[in-house]
């Protein structure tokens, strides 16, 4: 529901290493002196690749934004080791076949030689991974208006591709939380309204998916695991599925939204088997019409004590695990990621073994780097050290207009 400005992942530089921690980057044999070529930079060439990541054995296509002068060379590095070098003879585009070792990251350096000095004119990284979940770099899209044509979405995804974004979340793309499709399985609406009563064009959603897949990205549709709108009963959602603030099922729990929006969101029990079956059928409708690669599951963090229809207190954390298990069973070939809002339910989410990586939305009470360190440590334990972590990073509007500096662009 929030405007996520960037979704920052476990870092690509983790891939840019050898598995043995070697520190012999540039040194020669013991006691010898290695001749070092001076290096400087003049980063005047913008580079791009044709994909966000490459499976072992796939060829990389590089493109420069302008014709390169004669004598331009490119070398490929794995940390300090040069694993390949060649002249660029085709003006603006060339290909490279990386080593087939899985889960490695490389730096391509475009350079020219001047008076014995290597002048680097452009750089770009290459991720070679059979599974993008190993090094997830998560972006998002949130505007599905008429203007999102095939040409426009291709341009936007080219920008994300340049940042090596390999997963993309579709924020608030759906019609209703309990009925994601605009229309029905057999008859889609050309245009429908999202939760904020903004127009969503079905063609725009499809344009984004197609553009992302051209770059090898994974497309993930967003939805709560337990949301229903005010008209849910007409769509088959039962009263007995809801979460209540009292044991006598008088007051439903809800997430209240601004006036003028489509509806408040009323919460159902994510562990309710009938609800799980219902929503998985709706998800099946989604997959039948859109080439999504998986489901970005959301929650709302810690709630007060809640009860099911029978007056029994509900353990939401365990309910999330049950929901994930049922969702994976219904669509075993689709990816799952679930938001652990302020760590809530992170252990239960990770211990299912059914999510592709951890996703943590961190709020003001966990604003220090020590908090991020603690989350990374906990997620390592919960995921048996097999899953990486993505943090949802929100724009600091007080600093947004200030330019900063960063390392050599990759």
Regions found by a protein language model. Give the residues of each.
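An acidic-aromatic substrate-binding cleft motif
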Residues: 121-176
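Active-site neighborhood of glycoside hydrolase catalytic domains
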Residues: 271-358, 363-378
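Active-site-adjacent "subsite" loops/lids of carbohydrate-active enzymes
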Residues: 130-136, 142-150, 221-290
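Sec-dependent signal peptide recognition
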Residues: 2-7
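Aromatic- and acidic-residue-enriched carbohydrate-binding clefts of CAZyme catalytic domains
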Residues: 174-205, 233-270, 301-318
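Beta-strand-enriched, solvent-exposed domains that form extended recognition/catalytic surfaces
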Residues: 36-131
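Active-site-proximal substrate-binding groove within the catalytic cores of carbohydrate-active enzymes
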Residues: 338, 353-354, 369-410
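Bacterial Sec-dependent N-terminal signal peptides
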Residues: 13-42
